[in-house]
């Protein structure tokens, strides 16, 4: 196993802090913000979907391995619950996809934008999509009662479930 590393918090925003160059040069610094970590000049194209209409495009900033990318929200269409008990007992959901196949998604919560803590870890799942939102980006959200898409500030941290590029 690798060595554990801690993440330093930086609540300061400036012309330098929060840029792509700054984050690449300082991977162990987490930028706290009440807003999007890209601030007013955010770049919605970093994960390949600047207009919200592009599907499954790989970019150099995409955190997925070669041959995979951050999915657009259409990848989650056709998902249905197996059961509420499934989520409550297994810290995740076994989704039925398009009526036949199943796939397990853990409930990992998300790292809150304004605090150094994981919120809702036991019973909610948050998976980033490549779709930009008005104040952040969209994520696929699920718990023991529903599933949907909603926006989350980019200063928050959520899971990424990579999809194979076809």
How would you name each of these model-derived features?
Residues 5-12, 26, 31-166:
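C-terminal, surface-exposed recognition/capping segments
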Residues 1-21:
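Aromatic-Pro/Gly-enriched surface loop or interdomain linker
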């Amino acid at each position: 196993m690798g060595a554990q590393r801690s993440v330093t918090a930086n609540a300061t925003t400036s012309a330098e802090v929060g840029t792509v160059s700054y984050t690449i040069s300082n991977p162990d610094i987490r930028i706290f913000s009440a807003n999007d970590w890209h601030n007013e000049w955010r770049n919605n194209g970093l994960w390949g979907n600047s207009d919200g209409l592009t599907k499954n495009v790989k970019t150099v900033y995409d955190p997925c391995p070669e041959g995979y990318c951050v999915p657009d929200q259409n990848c989650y269409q056709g998902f249905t619950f197996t059961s509420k008990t499934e989520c409550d007992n297994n810290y995740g959901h076994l989704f039925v996809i398009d009526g036949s196949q199943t796939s397990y998604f853990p409930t990992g919560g998300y790292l809150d934008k304004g605090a150094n803590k994981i919120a809702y870890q036991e019973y909610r799942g948050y998976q980033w999509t490549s779709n930009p939102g008005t104040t952040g980006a969209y994520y696929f959200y699920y718990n023991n009662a529903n599933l949907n898409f909603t926006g989350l500030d980019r200063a928050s941290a959520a899971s990424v479930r990579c999809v194979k590029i076809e």
